[in-house]
UniProtKB/Swiss-Prot annotation:
Residues at which GTP 1 binds: 10-17, 57-61, 119-122
Protein's UniProt keywords contain Ubl conjugation: no
Entry superkingdom: Bacteria
SUPFAM superfamilies: P-loop containing nucleoside triphosphate hydrolases (SSF52540)
Annotated residues for binding of GTP 2: 181-188, 229-233, 294-297
GO MF terms held by the record: GTP binding; ribosome binding
Protein name listed in UniProt: GTPase Der
Subunit structure: Associates with the 50S ribosomal subunit.
UniProt gene name: der
The keyword NADP is assigned to this record: no
Length: 436
């Protein structure tokens, strides 16, 4: 289920990124072991009082060449479009500026809650400066020192108080997927082609957190799908719609809301860093992944082309060896009919449950093939394994000492489990836990 979203806005040098880092905590500095997989600094998850939410630093999306006021308006537009709660950051040191008033006037138009955070209140003497900010007409100002971590708890309390109530779980029978890729890989053409394949359009469904439109349709076998909207802002976003950082943010939002991600590549352009970055985020988020190579009609081919592309994809996306690859053309409709079946197979893999007895047979056979490692004379002992969840399938392996379970041995066990069962298109998680 999609997390609610909080956007941080404000003019430059008021401390938006510092507040973002405080709210995000240690999550923001995480760099994954897998090459090409890192958390983007403009979008991450946070948690407070047992409520999780996504947080956007709109300042990280700015086009630095754009005029100053245009940058600020862009931030506010993103916040009003994307967010459930807006945190407007100002500076106690500079007081109210023309830019602050400009943003406040834009935010007046939104019906979403706005939390006014007065940053740089670094000592008690500065607290009196916050009262001037009542003039912005945005309610009570919250004194904050991002540099010292003072007042962020109050801002977080206000955020949680204003988050939308947790929605009921959506039907698990509907498969939610999104098409993700760089601008000009043909996502829009693919969407139109998929929806034009004699499908029954049930109804456009308003997005839960913004003015996005998701589309629900049913295939000839009666399976219901929801295609998650990734269209971006419908306002005068202009040039920003195609900027990479904004595109990354939209992709991450769509991935969060999806069960399965169709990673669209352009056969004419090959694989780029952006593609690897987004695929890594989807893998890290535990989503099903299908690699879709579009514009297959537009390139010259011989009997080696498919094999070369497959090898190139496996080499560049080494962390998703489980992802099926489909070569399509939105123009000629080539192989488009295969996509729903591939999506359904991935969904089935995501929801696979393995009986504990069968799983333990596979794990013990794996140990017989490749004995558990030792460290300083002590050997890892595996007692038993059990599956604890699906989407993605997650397995807990109970051992004598968690520290003895090296990641390379976990990877070996994962490979053995994959060989024994069909987990096409989905990551699986293995967690070592000490038996009590």
């Amino acid at each position: 289920m999609a997390l609610p979203t909080v956007a941080i806005v404000g003019r430059p040098n008021v401390g938006k990124s510092a507040l973002f880092n405080r709210i995000a905590g240690e999550r923001i500095s995480i760099v994954e072991d897998v090459e090409g997989v890192t958390r983007d600094r403009i979008y991450t998850k946070a948690e407070w009082l047992n409520r999780q939410f996504s947080i956007i630093d709109t300042g990280g999306i700015d086009d630095v060449d754009a005029p100053f006021m245009e940058q600020i308006k862009h931030q506010a537009d993103i916040a009003m479009t994307e967010a459930d709660v807006i945190v407007f950051v100002v500076s106690a040191k500079e007081g109210i500026t023309d830019a602050d008033e400009y943003v406040a006037k834009i935010l007046y138009r939104t019906h979403k809650p706005v939390i006014l955070a007065v940053n740089k209140v670094d000592n008690p003497e500065m607290r009196s400066a916050i009262y001037d900010f009542y003039a912005l007409g945005l309610g009570d100002p919250y004194p904050v020192s991002s540099a010292h971590g003072i007042g962020t708890g109050d801002v977080l309390d206000a955020i949680v108080d204003n988050l939308p109530t947790e929605a009921q779980e959506e039907s698990s029978d509907i498969i939610k997927f999104s098409l993700i890729g760089r601008p000009n890989v043909g996502k829009s053409s693919l969407i139109n082609a998929i929806l034009g394949e004699d499908r029954v359009i049930a109804s456009p469904v308003a997005g839960t957190t913004r003015d996005a439109i998701d589309t629900t349709f049913t295939d000839e076998e009666g399976q219901e799908f929801t295609m998650i909207d990734t269209a971006g802002m419908r306002k005068s976003g202009k040039v920003y719609e195609n900027t990479e950082k904004y595109s990354v943010m939209r992709a991450m939002r769509a991935i969060d809301r999806s069960d399965i991600v169709l990673m669209v590549l352009n056969a004419e352009e090959g694989i780029r860093e952006y593609d690897k970055r987004i695929a890594g985020f989807a893998h890290e988020a535990g989503k099903g992944i299908v690699v879709v190579v579009n514009k297959w009609d537009a390139i010259k081919k011989d009997n080696r082309t498919v094999a070369q592309w497959e090898a190139d994809i496996r080499d560049n996306f080494q962390y998703i060896p489980y992802a099926p690859i489909v070569f399509v053309s939105a123009v000629t409709k080539q192989r488009l009919h295969k996509l729903p079946d591939v999506i359904k197979q991935v969904s089935q893999s995501q929801n696979t449950r393995i009986p504990s007895a069968v799983l333990n047979d596979v794990v013990m056979d794996a140990v017989a093939i490749n004995p558990t490692p030792t460290d300083k004379g002590k050997r890892l002992k595996i007692f038993y394994a059990t599956q604890v969840s699906v989407k993605p399938p997650t397995f807990v392996i109970f051992v004598n000492e968690e520290e003895l379970m090296h990641f390379s041995y976990l990877r070996f066990l994962e490979n053995q489990i994959r060989q024994a069962f069909v987990f096409e298109g989905t990551p699986i998680r293995l967690i070592a836990r000490k038996r009590k």
